[in-house]
Amino acid sequence: MSLLTEVETYVLSIVPSGPLKAEIAQRLEDVFAGKNTDLEALMEWLKTRPILSPLTKGILGFVFTLTVPSERGLQRRRFVQNALNGNGDPNNMDRAVKLYRKLKREITFHGAKEVALSYSTGALASCMGLIYNRMGTVTTEVAFGLVCATCEQIADSQHRSHRQMVTTTNPLIRHENRMVLASHTAKAMEQMAGSSEQAAERMEVAGQARQMVQAMRTIGTHPSSSAGLKDDLLENLQAYQKRMGVQMQRFK
């Protein structure tokens, strides 16, 4: 896996699924291929994206700034600076300075990533902020190691909370989680519909699922009643995708 492919993988792992994720993936590909060289327009686009957390925007802004060649005097963006200030916690800044000193001694992506992984997300974000604000300099490879370590920590915490949600023993939470997942699957089906032959059928199944979830929420049902809902939807989606030769993984 090339360095830029690895960076793209880690960064996309913290972006919520949906049309925006596909758009960001395309922007990253263009930036890494040298096809998008207007940093100012790119940052303006990023600033106005919905759904993304401030930290995710900050990380993406940092990656774009590292990669796109720009004029030396180009102003730093406030939304990136605010996201990479470690929540204003002086402890994060102290740790960030210590981490920065260690990163100065590193020369490889993997070396930098390994060093960075032992720090908290707040300290990692603050360290990115130091570099972004030109208060310190490291090689691009080392900066990317810092980015990937931060994304890995964020993705790990998201995965842990997802696992806790799945294994929770509270039937009401499990019931709601199944309905949320069913809704998301229906949304994915609608987004994939396009103008294919199966589009009408897929839209119909997705619409029925949405109605079912809405009805279950409106009238209230026993928690066990939603058990098969998500699985039925996933099976339908998988069947349609198989027919079209599209892989299923991203919707599991």
Curated annotation (Swiss-Prot):
Subcellular location: Virion membrane; Host nucleus
Main location: virion
InterPro entries: Flu_matrix_M1 (IPR036039), Flu_matrix_M1_C (IPR013188), Flu_matrix_M1_N (IPR001561), Flu_matrix_M1_N_sub1 (IPR015423), Flu_matrix_M1_N_sub2 (IPR015799), INFV_M1 (IPR037533)
Any single biological process term in GO: viral budding from plasma membrane
The keyword Zinc belongs to this UniProt entry's keyword annotation: no
UniProt subunit comment: Homodimer and homomultimer. Interacts with NEP. Binds ribonucleocapsid by both interacting with genomic RNA and NP protein. May interact with HA and NA. Cannot bind NP without genomic RNA.
Record family assignment: Belongs to the influenza viruses Matrix protein M1 family.
Protein name according to UniProt: Matrix protein 1
Organism whose genome encodes this protein: Influenza A virus (strain A/Budgerigar/Hokkaido/1/1977 H4N6)
Source lineage: Viruses, Riboviria, Orthornavirae, Negarnaviricota, Polyploviricotina
Gene name tied to this protein: M
